[in-house]
């Protein structure tokens, strides 16, 4: 799959006392883009849990904060699978405001059995859509 993009508006609740986006909230923006990426190819995470006892969890995160985002700005959040193995994906993600890169991340997502919390094979149907 090509790079997926999702618009995010910065709300007051996303900012800190200095009026800039609180650093942890960038992770929420990245999460929304990955969720919407899955949704765009027909996979709802609640259905994956109910039907296949499958969940996705963050395994590791590497983030570089380059420039601040501020209240009421419209941002573009991207997500692209750059590597996949049998039980995990690695996403390359960025947050951009008018061609200015504000934040980049490499996020590894593991596929787990929801009950045992042990690694589970990523369904082939998902891999077909995200590669």
Predicted regions and their residues:
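HotDog/MaoC-like acyl-thioester-processing domains
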Residues: 4, 39, 70-72, 82-131
């Amino acid at each position: 799959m090509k790079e997926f993009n999702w618009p995010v508006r910065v709300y007051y609740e996303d900012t800190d006392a200095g009026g800039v986006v609180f650093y942890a909230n960038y992770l929420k923006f990245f999460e929304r883009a990955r969720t919407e990426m899955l949704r765009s190819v027909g996979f709802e995470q609640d259905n994956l849990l109910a039907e296949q006892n499958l969940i996705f969890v963050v395994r590791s995160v590497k983030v570089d904060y380059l420039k601040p985002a501020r209240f009421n700005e419209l941002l573009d959040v991207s997500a692209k699978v750059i590597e996949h193995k049998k039980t995990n994906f690695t996403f390359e993600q960025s947050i951009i405001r008018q061609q200015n890169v504000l934040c980049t991340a490499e996020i590894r997502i593991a596929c787990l059995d929801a009950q045992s919390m042990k690694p589970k094979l990523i369904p082939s149907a998902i891999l077909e859509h995200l590669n």
